[in-house]
Amino acid sequence: MYLVVTRTFPPEVGGMQNLMWGLARSLSKLNLIKVFADYNEGHEEFDKTVSFSIERVSGIKILRKYRKASLINEYLNQNPKVSCIVADHWKSLELIKTNKKKICLIHSKEINHKKGSRLNQKVLNVLNNVDHVIANSNFTKKLAVDIGVEEKKILVINPGVDPIKEIPKNDLKKAEEILNGKKQ
C-alpha cells in the first residue's frame, strides 16, 4: 500500500494539483493507495468519483499541518502494509515519523532558501532523510545539490501532460466570456 501526502489536490485547479492527481491515479493502478489531502470546498463530489480513499484535513493552515501529520502517523502505526509514502513537498513530510520508504517531489521555488538559514536546515533535514528526491527539472536538481541535498538521492522527472478528453462546459463558458468580453 502507498500513501500520497499532498497539500494540493483536485478539485482545486492548478499545475501541482494536476500532477498529484495523475500520480495518485497512476499509483492506484499498481497498488492500493490512500491520499491525505488538504480540505477543498466541493471535494465531496470529486472524491466520490475516484477508486481510492481520500482523507481530507481541514482547519487553519498552521494547525492543519500538525493535525494532518498526527493523522498520518496514527494511520502508519495502524497499517503495517504501507510500504511507501509519496509527498508533494518537503513540508508534507516534515512531521512524519516512520522508517517506511519516502519519496519527495521538489520544485526550485520551495527549496530556494539561503544556505545555512533555518529554513535551509529544515529542508535538508527532510530531504536528506528520504529515500528518493524527485526534482522537476535539471535546474531544480542543481539548486538542491547546491543547497546541500545529497545528489545520489535526486532523480529528475520532468512534468508530463494529462490531456483531457472533453473540456468542461463551465470552463468553456468562462474562456468565452474572457475572450469575447469587453475591453477594460
Where are these regions (language model features)?
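Charged active-site motifs of nucleotide-sugar-dependent glycosyltransferases
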Residues: 1, 181-184
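N-terminal strand-loop element at the rim of the active site
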Residues: 6-13, 19-64
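A short, histidine- and acid-enriched strand-loop-helix "catalytic/donor-clamping" loop
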Residues: 12, 92-94, 102-118, 129-132
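Carbohydrate-associated surface elements
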Residues: 39, 139, 160
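Short, well-structured alpha-helical segments in soluble
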Residues: 70-81
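A short beta-strand/loop micro-motif in the catalytic core of glycosyltransferases
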Residues: 85-86, 129-137
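Short His-centered aromatic/hydrophobic patch
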Residues: 86-92
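A short helix/loop element that forms part of the nucleotide-sugar donor recognition site in Leloir-type
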Residues: 167-182
